[in-house]
Curated annotation (Swiss-Prot):
Cellular location(s): Mitochondrion inner membrane
Gene that this polypeptide is encoded by: ATM1
Protein known as: Iron-sulfur clusters transporter ATM1, mitochondrial
Family note: Belongs to the ABC transporter superfamily. ABCB family. Heavy Metal importer (TC 3.A.1.210) subfamily.
Keyword Lipid metabolism found: no
Species assigned in the record: Candida albicans (strain SC5314 / ATCC MYA-2876) (Yeast)
Region annotation Disordered: where it falls in the sequence: 43-100, 437-462
Transmembrane parts of this sequence: 125-146, 170-193, 243-266, 268-288, 355-373, 389-410
Mitochondrial matrix domain ranges by topology: 17-124, 194-242, 289-354, 411-750
């Protein structure tokens, strides 16, 4: 209505500014192509797609795994653990302040979307950027077509109705085509770049997960699992946003601001350009400074979020302990305290965001009002047309879109970089337990020919001799565990390691597995220093039943198969029978497909230990360790199970090392090594240590346990005697009552 009532004062100033590239003035003024920015819909779709497909590690350690309904067969080869995905120019290990900087993270991230020797990725990135440029070219023409439509409507076409219809129709079609083309190119760009972005997220998450698996045990003992999984989760989401922001936000914003400033300067003079420049400068300075001030609130919220996740994970993992000690309210209060810190930080984030948005809107609205006033003055004086006024309005509003995104993108970019900070810190953690370059595999003596030597008493030809030479080690420099310890575990024999608590028994297992490196000395297996062989070959040849059986939240079948991933179902059922799990499994409704629960909490401790033994037997390792492996079993089951395992080990000539507190379980060992205060104080067989050294530490431990057992048996005998006496008393009372009843009945009959 407004346009119809406008009367042109001077027809001569009417100028048709043709869209690119049809008119020289415009084609000269606009030399940078840009793309229409994300609409709210496309932005949310892209972000949600990125977020939903991000890899979450938390599911690996904290979430409930999905049950598997069908067992694997031998026809499927075991999945091979791939090494971390490498770009040829990966960053060096180690953490430093420069590596943890934002520039380092962005540089590392760029390598994931532009990897060397990956032409497919590069082609996709180039196509996506080309579509970005094409969409920007179409998008910038939309306000020019709209201006020409308005100016055309203000010309008297009374005598040229046909020409008017043709011109207006062409401009309207061009307007609609340019707008639709810009949106279409933007969506195509999103679709093509999506695989690049998601692949980059997968690469970073995978490399981080593999890095965590390769970290030493001390690292994991000093970290909380909830914080690690939350760092990976937030970091992958941050990568998704940073990639979309850098490729589709920062570059288009820069192009769009440059184009609009150039158009205003060329067509409408320096005053409009100066106003635009001052607005951009004030807007950017305000946004950057305010966002830098708000960053500390986001960091506080992240720390509180990690703390809440750790409390929740600890409470759920130790669910039984919480219930046993009736401490639900205590755990809930701890969780609520962490949530309160997160709430306080989140409120600060929200209020500071409101301040930031208000300031940004004030700056932009002030600039828009001033520019509209200048444009109306130009229309009034006849220097500008109504179409020019509309063009200025649309260009400034078109500038408002990237300006609004500039604020939100900068805020989200800073937040995403904070979220990525912990993720990249994990990637740059130094690995303490390393192999030497080109480390050879561990090769055992006579490894392939040990089944035909039943009459050979020379154990040197058997595989699996372990020798400690002057080994010293401590978890902390001020608390040594092993002090110049030297001993030999002969190949093919059953050897027991005993001693008081804290003497270093379980530490020996960790050192043989190279979970830690020793401070001095050497550990040899068949004469080979374990620090100079590959970790994979070392751990492949060693099996263990630990004190606390680690089980996955999976089926019984898959937990046993974990000992050897290529094992067939028949082999698994055979070891199930050997460890006497078949009766239990037969009584379960789902059999071997029964889910054992988080950390195996749905089965008993003894059943978990037998499952761990089945896993060990399936692995068929030539060197085996038992760390209090039967502590949760009753005496009858323990003896039957140990008899079966001894038979298997004897047939296969396996080196068997047992760590035990209950000395009766290792009395038949070929050799017993006694530790005390980190040193080997005694060695020998059970009878040698008792008879030849009656005052030995082993003899003292044995006598203490035997006396306790005797006292226990006597107590049991006393209890049984008391029960028998009570029973006799009850029987006597019952007989007396029956006699009285009989006499009374007889008297009544008489």
């Amino acid at each position: 209505m407004f346009i119809r009532n406008v009367k042109l004062i001077k027809p001569s100033p009417v100028r048709f500014i043709s869209p690119i590239p049809f008119s020289f003035p415009i084609s000269r003024s606009i030399k940078i192509s840009s793309i229409r920015y994300f609409t709210n819909k496309s932005t949310s779709n892209f972000k949600s797609t990125s977020s939903s497909s991000s890899l979450k590690s938390t599911s690996t350690s904290t979430s409930t795994s999905t049950s598997k309904t069908t067992p694997k067969t031998l026809s499927k080869p075991p999945p091979k653990v791939k090494p971390p995905i490498q770009d040829n120019d990966t960053t060096s290990s180690g953490s430093s302040s420069s590596e943890n900087s934002e520039s380092f993270m962005l540089k590392s991230l760029f390598k994931t979307i532009w990897p060397k020797n990956n032409l497919n990725f590069k082609i996709r990135v180039i196509i996506a950027l080309s579509l970005l440029v094409g969409a920007k070219i179409l998008n910038v023409q939309v306000p020019f077509y709209f201006k020409q439509i308005i100016d055309t409507m203000n010309i008297d076409w009374t005598n040229e109705v046909g020409v008017f219809s043709t011109v207006i129709g062409s401009l309207i079609l061009a307007y609609g085509g340019a707008r639709f083309g810009a949106v279409l190119f933007g969506e195509l760009r999103n679709a093509i770049f999506a695989s690049v972005a998601q692949s980059a997220i997968r690469r970073v998450a995978y490399n981080t997960f593999v890095k965590l698996l390769n970290m030493d045990l001390q690292f994991h003992l000093s970290r909380q699992t909830g914080g690690l999984t939350r760092a990976i989760d937030r970091g992958t989401k941050g990568i998704s946003y940073v990639l979309s922001a850098m490729v589709f936000h920062i570059i288009p914003i820069t192009l769009e601001i440059s184009i609009v400033c150039g158009i205003l300067t060329y067509n409408y003079g320096a005053s409009f350009a100066a106003m635009t420049f001052v607005t951009m400068l004030a807007y950017s300075i305000f946004t950057i400074q305010t966002t830098a001030w708000r960053t500390k609130f986001r960091r506080q919220a992240n720390n509180a979020d990690n703390q809440a996740a750790n409390v929740a994970l600890d409470s759920l993992i130790n669910y039984e302990s919480v219930k046993i000690f009736n401490n639900e309210l205590y755990q809930a209060s701890k969780y609520d305290k962490a949530l309160m810190k997160y709430q306080q930080s989140s409120v600060k984030i929200a209020t500071s965001l409101a301040f930031l948005n208000s300031g940004q809107n004030f700056i932009f609205t002030s600039a828009l009002t001033a520019m509209m006033y200048m444009g109306c003055q130009g229309v009034y004086t006849g220097e500008l047309t109504v179409g020019d006024l509309v063009l200025i309005n649309q260009l400034v509003f078109q500038l408002s879109v990237p300006l609004n995104f500039l604020g939100s993108v900068y805020r989200e970019l800073k937040q995403s970089l904070l979220d990525m900070e912990n993720l990249f810190q994990l990637q740059n953690q130094p690995i303490r337990i390393k192999e030497i370059p080109n480390a050879p595999p561990l090769k055992l003596n006579n490894n392939n020919n040990n089944n035909n030597n039943n009459n050979n008493n020379n154990n040197n030809s058997l595989p699996g001799e372990i020798r400690f030479e002057n080994v010293s080690f401590g978890y902390h420099p001020d608390r040594p565990i092993l002090n110049n310890a030297s001993f030999t575990i002969p190949a093919g024999q059953k050897v027991a390691i005993v001693g008081p608590s804290g003497s270093g028994k379980s530490t020996i297992l960790r050192l043989i597995f190279r979970f830690y490196d020793i401070n001095q000395g050497r550990i040899l297996i068949d004469g080979q220093d374990i620090s100079k062989v590959s970790l994979e070959s070392l751990r492949k040849l060693i099996g263990i039943v630990p004190q606390e059986t680690p089980l996955f939240n999976d089926t019984i079948l898959e937990n046993i198969r974990y000992g050897r991933l290529d094992a067939s179902d028949e082999e698994i059922y055979r070891v199930i029978n050997q460890v006497q799990l078949n009766k239990l499994i037969d009584d379960l409704p789902d059999g071997v497909q029964t889910i054992v629960g988080e950390r195996g909490m749905m089965i008993s401790g003894g059943e978990k230990q037998r499952l761990a033994m089945a896993r060990l037997l399936l692995k068929r390792a030539p060197i085996t360790f038992f760390d209090e492996a039967t502590s949760a079993l009753d005496t009858h089951t323990e003896q039957a199970l140990l008899k079966t395992i001894r038979s298997v080990f004897k047939q296969q000539h396996q080196t068997n090392v047992s760590i035990a507190h209950r000395l009766r379980t290792i009395a038949d060992a070929d050799k017993i090594i006694v530790l005390n205060k980190g040193q080997v104080v005694e060695e020998g067989t059970h009878w040698q240590l008792l008879n030849e050294q009656p005052n030995s530490l082993y003899a003292q431990l044995w006598n203490i346990q035997e006396n306790l057992d005797i006292e226990k048996e006597l107590l049991q005998g006393d209890e049984e005697e008391e029960e028998l006496t009570e029973k006799l008393k009850l029987d006597k009372q019952e007989l007396e009552q029956e006699a009285k009843l009989f006499n009374s009945q007889t008297f009544e009959k008489k």
